[in-house]
């Protein structure tokens, strides 16, 4: 999969089944890799996904411009395009970050928040693409993950984030 052939766009109602598949894959991946407690009980729920889509805060990473085995082109304007990743992004105060238990924020400026990042396991660099997209919208970003999610903690730090 060529990341150059991916676009990021707002999620739409028609994407919901694929989004739920990606989150299901992410839950099983996390459980198999020492993180069985994050997103348990089928979180994020369909209701949360609906709210995120309605609010315009859910984004998908979609592969475009490829061909299937039968030679049919896939792309963002084609129903056969493939969504490989999903993430929540919103600019403005996030209730999750009203209180920081240990440490201090690096900046009190207006910020964007990234939550619920997940990929389908077929591509690498989903978080990197999400961060690059969000950085084009606002300078200051915040992100967090579950204490048991060591893989995501590593990837977050690899993308330039500092623990506060």
Predicted regions and their residues:
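Conserved beta-strand in the GNAT
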Residues: 60, 81-93
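Conserved acyl-donor/pantetheine-binding loop and adjacent beta-alpha core of acyl/acetyltransferases
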Residues: 88-122
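Conserved acetyl-CoA-binding loop-helix of GNAT-fold acetyltransferases
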Residues: 119-136, 153-158
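Conserved GNAT-fold acetyl-CoA-binding loop/helix
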Residues: 27-47
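A short beta-loop-alpha structural element at the N-terminal edge
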Residues: 6-21
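Conserved GNAT acetyl-CoA-binding A-motif
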Residues: 136-148
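Conserved active-site alpha-helix within GNAT-family acetyltransferase domains
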Residues: 148-164
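Short hydrophobic/aromatic beta-strand element in the GNAT-like acyltransferase core
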Residues: 57-60, 86, 116, 142
